[in-house]
């Protein structure tokens, strides 16, 4: 049997700030819940009062609306779906239901894949950054300063920033996956112990019955006769 040190077992299920992966997943789910709830409140207030968040074409540097009603409804539906997924992950980690964490884990994989595609696009088409910056409205903060930066340096800075984000997101994915494996393994070990205890109870007879049967089956030894 392989012996595992207590500190090794602890750090194998620990994440940032030395907390358990289950605790980290709960905190991550709550954090995503707060963010999506704030976004939902902003979208609902914008839907209730469109003039407050309305931007004209001159302000945006183009002939298009900032967000119409159809896009607003789609964004609200996505926010509601994200709140449901985050709530499922938080509840699943708290109540130790591994299946409830899967939707949140799939969302993390999808988000990581999108950011990876953005990094690949920046790397393959570096001129697309300059084109995107030119399409920004003139009132955008630091637009002229960003345009004056060397394109190669700008690409390197953006790639470094995206790389840091991808590293952090990958770490969060590993934490959630470790929490899923921990809950799955714990539930499996509980079932295994339960089945083993029942088998032991059924297979082993009571001690009194075993000694009684053994005592009746044994015959006394023959008497000793001296030569």
Curated annotation (Swiss-Prot):
Start and end residues of each stretch annotated as Required for NEDD4 interaction: 205-222
Entry keywords, A to Z: Cell membrane, Cell projection, Endosome, Lysosome, Membrane, Transmembrane, Transmembrane helix, Transport, Ubl conjugation
UniProt record, GO biological process: endosome organization; endosome transport via multivesicular body sorting pathway; negative regulation of lysosomal protein catabolic process; negative regulation of transforming growth factor beta1 production; regulation of lysosomal membrane permeability; regulation of lysosome organization
One Gene Ontology term, aspect cellular component: late endosome membrane
A GO molecular-function descriptor: ceramide binding
Keyword Transmembrane helix attached: yes
Function of the molecule: Required for optimal lysosomal function. Blocks EGF-stimulated EGFR intraluminal sorting and degradation. Conversely by binding with the phosphatidylinositol 4,5-bisphosphate, regulates its PIP5K1C interaction, inhibits HGS ubiquitination and relieves LAPTM4B inhibition of EGFR degradation. Recruits SLC3A2 and SLC7A5 (the Leu transporter) to the lysosome, promoting entry of leucine and other essential amino acid (EAA) into the lysosome, stimulating activation of proton-transporting vacuolar (V)-ATPase protein pump (V-ATPase) and hence mTORC1 activation.
Family as reported in the entry's similarity comment: Belongs to the LAPTM4/LAPTM5 transporter family.
Protein name per Swiss-Prot or TrEMBL: Lysosomal-associated transmembrane protein 4B
Organism: Rattus norvegicus
Encoding gene (name): Laptm4b
């Amino acid at each position: 049997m392989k012996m595992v040190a207590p500190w090794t077992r602890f750090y194998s299920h620990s994440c940032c700030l030395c907390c358990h992966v289950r605790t980290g997943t709960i905190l991550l789910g709550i954090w995503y819940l707060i963010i999506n709830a704030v976004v939902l409140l902003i979208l609902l207030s914008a839907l209730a009062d469109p003039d407050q968040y309305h931007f004209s074409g001159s302000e945006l540097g183009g002939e298009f609306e900032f967000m119409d009603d159809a896009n607003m409804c789609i964004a609200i539906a996505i926010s509601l779906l994200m709140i449901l997924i985050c709530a499922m992950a938080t509840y699943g980690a708290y109540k130790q239901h591994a299946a409830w964490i899967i939707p949140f884990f799939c969302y993390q994989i999808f988000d990581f894949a999108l950011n990876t595609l953005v990094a690949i696009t920046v790397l393959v088409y570096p001129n697309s950054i300059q084109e995107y910056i030119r399409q920004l409205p003139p009132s955008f903060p630091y637009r002229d300063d960003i345009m004056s930066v060397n394109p190669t340096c700008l690409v390197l800075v953006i790639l470094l920033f995206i790389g840091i984000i991808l590293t952090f997101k990958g770490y969060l994915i590993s934490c959630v996956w470790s929490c899923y494996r921990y809950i799955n393994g714990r539930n499996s070990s509980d079932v295994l112990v339960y089945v083993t205890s029942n088998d032991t109870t059924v297979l082993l007879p009571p001690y009194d019955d075993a000694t009684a049967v053994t005592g009746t089956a044994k015959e006394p030894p023959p008497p000793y006769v001296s030569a």
